[in-house]
Amino acid sequence: MEFSVKSGSPEKQRSACIIVGVFEPRRLSSIAEQLDKISDGYISALLRRGELEGKVGQSLLLHHVPNVLSERILLIGCGKERELDERQYKQIIQKTINTLNETGSMEAVCFLTELHVKGRNNYWKVRQAVETAKESLYAFNQLKSNKNELRRPLRKMVFNVPTRRELTSGERAIQHGLAIAAGIKAAKDLSNMPPNICNAAYLASQARQLADSANSHITTKVIGEEQMKELGMNAYLAVGQGSQNESLMSVMEYKGSSDKHAKPIILVGKGLTFDSGGISIKSAGGMDEMKYDMCGAATVYGVMRVVSELQLPLNVIGVMAGCENMPGGRAYRPGDILTTLSGQTVEVLNTDAEGRLVLCDALTYVERFDPELVIDIATLTGACITALGNHYSGLLSNHNPLAHELLNASEQSGDRAWRLPMTDEFFEQIDSNFADLANTGGSGGGAITAACFLSRFATKYHWAHLDIAGTAWRSGKTKGATGRPVALLSQFLLNRAGSAGINNDD
C-alpha cells in the first residue's frame, strides 16, 4: 500500500472515497460538518434517522453524496470526542482499513488526522496511522500450501493535514512509519518461523543477508562454538551443548555517524530458537510457543532493519545470541558451576533459567566495542508476565537517565514499558554457597532477580534490560509474534539521532 500526504479542503477532493469521523452521540467532526453543509444536510439527516451512532467500531459508507466530488464518503465512529485516546485512535484506523478493503476501495483520502488525540501532533497521528495500517494487513502464511490470500484492493491512502507547512512533517512521519512497520514485520516473520527452520544458523543467515542488501552500511560477523571456546564463553556454550544445532552469535555492525570517535549503541537479543527447559524440562502445555524464546534476537534484527532503512546518523551494533536449549546426554545439569567470559562463576540451579547464561557472556563480549550504552532484550521470565501482564515490557537499568529515555520512547511510540526496581535485597537472592552467584533467585521478584544477575555482567557501561516475556507474542486464537519492542527501540534511536518530530502537541 502506498501512502502520501496533502493539504486541501474536503469539497475539492476527487477521490474514490473520503474518510471522516463521527463522534457520539451522532455528532459530526469538523470536516464532516463541512461536507454536510456542502450536501445541504444530507449526512446529518442520515444520522438523525439513526444510521450511525458514532461508537468506536461503527462505520457507514455513503455513495454519491449530493454536491460532493468524491464517489463515496466513509463515516467512521470515533466514540466520545473528549475520551479519544491513543488506543482508540489506532482502533479507528484499523477499522477504517478493514472497511475500505471490504468495500473494494482502491484509494482514499483520510481526514482522521483532524481528530484531537491529547498530547499528540499530526506527525504522531500520521505515523501511527501508517504503522497501524501495515499491522492490520499482516499475515504469516509462508508455510501454508493454500495461502487463501485475503482480498485487499486498497492500494493508496492519502492523509490530509490542516496546513501546507505540515506537509514536511507528514512526509517524515510516513517515512518513519513505513520503516518501523517493515522492521516490525521482519521481527514477526523471524519470530513466527518454526524451530525446525529457525535455528541459530538461520538467524546468522538473516544477519548476513541484511549486511548484503544494498546500502545497508552493515557488516556482519558470526561467532561459532570454536571461537566461543577460545574466548571462554562457557555459560553461553553450556546452554546449547544438549542440542545438535550449533550455537552461533551474530554481530551486526552499522556505522552511520560522521564522527569517527562516536561510540556505538549496542542491542543484545536473546535468541533461544527453542527452549525445552533442558534437564529442568518444561511441561508439555504450550511448549510449542517456546519457539518465541528468540523474540529478543528478532527485535534486534527488526531494529537494525529500521536503522539501515532510515540511514540514522548513529553507530549501532546488534547482537543476536542464538542457540537452543535441549535435554540430552551432553546437556548441562542443575548443580553445574560455569566459569563465564567475565571470570565470574555461576551455579546452575535450574537449566530453564538459561537466557541469562547466554546473555551474561554476550554482555561481557560487547565490552570490546567500548559502547555508549547497551540494551538487552529478552523473553526472560514468566515472573514479568505475572507482574505486568501482556501490556507492558519490564524495564530495569543501572543508569537513571537511560531508563528515563527508554520510558519516554515507550510513551511516544505507544510500545509501553514499566520500570522495576533493583535494590540490594534482590541481589542477595542470587547469592550462592558454591559460586559467585546462582542462576535463579528463588521465589519472589523473579523478573528483578534475573535483571540483577545480568547487571553483574554490565558494570563497565550504562545498561538497560527489557523483559519482553509478556509482550513479544500472543497466545490463543490470535497466536503470533507482536514485533514488540521494535517500535520502542526505534523511537529511542530516532530520539538519539534527533530525527523524531513526535514530542510536541499541535
From Swiss-Prot:
Q: What is this protein called?
A: Probable cytosol aminopeptidase
Q: What is its EC number?
A: 3.4.11.1, 3.4.11.10
Keywords assigned: Aminopeptidase, Cytoplasm, Hydrolase, Manganese, Metal-binding, Protease
> Per its Swiss-Prot or TrEMBL entry, what cofactor is needed?
Mn(2+)
**Residues in coiled coil:** none
Q: Name the family.
A: Belongs to the peptidase M17 family.
NCBIfam families, per the entry: PRK00913.1-1, PRK00913.1-4
GO aspect biological process, one term: proteolysis
- Where found, per UniProt? Cytoplasm
Say which domain of life the source belongs to: Bacteria
Q: Which Pfam families match?
A: Peptidase_M17, Peptidase_M17_N
Give me the residues that bind Mn(2+) 2, please: 270, 275, 293, 354
* Residues where Mn(2+) 1 binds: 275, 352, 354
**Record's function text:** Presumably involved in the processing and regular turnover of intracellular proteins. Catalyzes the removal of unsubstituted N-terminal amino acids from various peptides.
User: Bound how, and how many: what does the cofactor note say?
Assistant: Binds 2 manganese ions per subunit.
Give the principal location in a single coarse category. cytoplasm
Q: Which PROSITE patterns match?
A: CYTOSOL_AP (PS00631)
Catalysed reaction(s)? Release of an N-terminal amino acid, Xaa-|-Yaa-, in which Xaa is preferably Leu, but may be other amino acids including Pro although not Arg or Lys, and Yaa may be Pro. Amino acid amides and methyl esters are also readily hydrolyzed, but rates on arylamides are exceedingly low; Release of an N-terminal amino acid, preferentially leucine, but not glutamic or aspartic acids
What are the record's GO terms for cellular component? cytoplasm
Active site residues according to the UniProt entry: 282, 356
